[in-house]
Amino acid sequence: MAIANKNIIFVAGLGGIGFDTSREIVKSGPKNLVILDRIENPAAIAELKALNPKVTVTFYPYDVTVSVAETTKLLKTIFDKLKTVDLLINGAGILDDYQIERTIAVNFTGTVNTTTAIMSFWDKRKGGPGGVIANICSVTGFNAIYQVPVYSASKAAALSFTNSLARLAPITGVTAYSINPGITKTTLVHKFNSWLDVEPRVAELLLEHPTQTTLQCAQNFVKAIEANQNGAIWKLDLGTLEAIEWTKHWDSHI
């Protein structure tokens, strides 16, 4: 899918990987980039607007843990304004296994609920035009970082959900693929808590291994968007982009 002149909604488009991806998307010239995030960042929005003045960048506050009804209400505001939306990126995520319920709510349930809400506008069974969903999951959905089992399980669930969405495309008209970053130097990785403190040094241990920058990840993310392959399981690791078969695995080596 060419990004040029498209209308894109990006949930959590101001985070580490998210913000660099927003930059790369804006460079590609969409008509509209609508960013939904929990915390407003006027400086970041201003930077995106200055990067390509031809692109309309809009921000709405959004917490993915709200109800489907609340999300649907927000999306109606956006659809009423834009008329059409081509791509939804679900990017919200936290890495803190102290917060069990919130981890599941943000990383999995939030993705499911946001997707469920947009189906009201896209589902071809309701007369909708269809659409494309890119869900940011994780390589931990392939093989867990076992010291953060809650995070890993939430990402595995999001990946499974995305794979199902892709299989449902002939019914709904909505295609989907997953974006699965490897270890990336973001604030998410620099400091986080393992489950029950089973490994206090887990973040430090991970960063002892080769990583990638958020820019490398973002550039490959845009390539995946352009490829627009329904059902693709994209691995974005060590600055590379690979469409993997489910029989392949990834290991944290710690």
From Swiss-Prot:
Keywords from the UniProt entry: NAD, Oxidoreductase
Record GO cellular component, one term: cytoplasm
Binding-site list for substrate: 138
Binding-site positions, NAD(+): 10-33
PROSITE patterns: ADH_SHORT
Family: Belongs to the short-chain dehydrogenases/reductases (SDR) family.
Quaternary structure and partners: Homodimer.
Protein name (record): Alcohol dehydrogenase 2
Organism of origin: Drosophila arizonae (Fruit fly)
Gene giving rise to this polypeptide: Adh2
